[in-house]
Amino acid sequence: RHAALPVSKIANPQDQPTGRATSLSRLWPFLRPQKSLGAGWLIFLAVSSGTTLLLPAMVRRIIDHGFKETSLTSLNATFMGLFGLALVLAVATAGRYFCITLLGERALASLRERLYDHVIRMDVDFFERSRVGELISRLSSDTEVVQALIGSGISVALRSAVMLVGAAIAMIWTSPRLAGLIALVIPAVMLPIMLFGRKVQRLSRLSQDRLADAAAIANETLNAAAAVKAYGREEIESRHYAEAIRAALSTARRRISTRALLTMIVIVLVFGAITVVLWAGARQVVAGTLDPGVLGQFVLYAVFAAGSVAGLSEVWGDVLRAAGAMERIGELLSERSQITDPPAPLRLASPTTGALRFEQVGFHYPSRPDRAALEQFDLHIGAGETVALVGPSGAGKSTVLALLLRFYDPQQGRILLDGIDLRELRLAELRGAMALVPQEAAIFAGSAAENLRFGRESATLEQVQAAARDAAAAEFIEALPQQYDTALGEHGVRLSGGQRQRLAIARAILRDAPLLLLDEATSALDARSEAVIQQALERAQRGRTTLVIAHRLATVKRADRIIVMDGGRIIAQGKHADLMAENGLYADLARLQFIDDGS
């Protein structure tokens, strides 16, 4: 069960990471709209960096002249100037932090919105290939890694880069000879960054993948909590999750060790270089060829430069992690739905009659290319007609509904609605003409009213209540603590199976669509509720084209026509009595599978 195809392998099967610049360039569309914040941040960055670089000059002045000043006024002015620089630095730093943090939050919000919008619009086949837990990991943990880079990493990186360049120029201006010594160790500092960088990126990507695997396992297990308990698998499932977490921890430990080693080497090399420079400068001061203030100023610039290099090496790890996360996000954004709107869509007539025609339709599921789900399927359903599809499991009944909803497109033939090929219609218009009652009702954590309005947001409370009454759902809804405003819990855990099904039927009634698709809509109801629902469905079916998949004889007998399917083909059709008289597959199903209520 846990060996399902990871999302990370869907779009890009290669294990090697793509270029860091390519991965991070995907962030630009989300950063570009924040130009004003970016400009403000750059201004504050320039002011804070410039102010910081002025501090060593003030220290030099104090060392060389301040303690020799005979005028108290001049001394006070020097220290007031130093305090003034500190005030400017404080304001600029606060402004820089505000701008970059808000920029990061806005960019991240746009990224998450774009990612969720992209995922929710993917076709059904994508979700069948993917693991929900991994998708949630992309939306949460991966974007949080990117947020760490945008919200603080970029700021630290650019501030460190500006300070490094500024300090380098200042060191050359202050003492070219000592600056030359610093230049000699730069290759030694940069070499480990280059060597360790790619390894950190690869481990960062692998670490995110392992966390996504753990999230997928948790999502699957928690969504099936009742089954886990029924089969006594708590310990086994806990062990599976622990193994996934330990795998993620092992990868994270390798990444952390590599990054820690990189930071240690850089700090040793940088501050070793400063020690050498300080030693050389001290010899010049002793020899009288260098003023103490100049050495102090140079050392401060060297410390700034060293801190900047250390900051860059630290942020480099965040850059590599973000590059790995954006690579995963980029793979997801690169996925393309195979079911899309046509370039020049046609429009359905208003009102839509609901006439359907299947013409030599052939279809196989992408996951089962060697097995036809429908084959040479021909069927005409007149406007307002109620047609029941019956047949053994795997006959292709649910496939007919899936193709009508354009969850998939047939590989052969075509399907027409009011004479228009479904592929020539906008998906929103096509699906807006249909109301589906699935075998397992999808109930959300919102209120009862919100669940009923799922297919029709604009419905008034009176319309919601009327639909609930028609579906025999009003009685139990009005018995809830807040009636229609009562939250139903995730997956409708506060409701019975029959209550959830009645909510789904009420939702379809409220949608008021010209086509009604019922996939064993009364399967979870008791006999009394089914009798009430059958009356409601009969009212809902008037003037509408209805396609019913049913295992109950009472449901089938009310249909205008019964279509008997087997192996993806139509093998018989007609009225109940005629099909029973033929004593074929339908008669066998009626005797063995259908539930006869005695009618």
Feature names for model-found ranges:
Residues 1-55, 67-82, 96-104, 117, ...:
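Membrane-integrated ABC transporters
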Residues 12-20, 43-44, 51-64, 85-132, ...:
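Juxtamembrane helix-loop junctions of ABC transporter transmembrane domains
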Residues 33, 37-50, 88, 152-206, ...:
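Transmembrane helices of ABC transporter permease
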Residues 33-35, 124-125, 141-150, 154, ...:
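An intracellular "coupling" helix at the cytosolic face of ABC transporter transmembrane type-1 domains
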Residues 71-73, 77, 170-184, 254, ...:
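Helix-loop-helix
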Residues 119, 241, 329, 358-360:
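Conserved catalytic Walker-motif region of ABC-type ATPase nucleotide-binding domains
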Residues 338-351:
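Pre-NBD coupling/linker segments of ABC/ABC-like ATPases
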Residues 349-599:
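ABC-type nucleotide-binding domain
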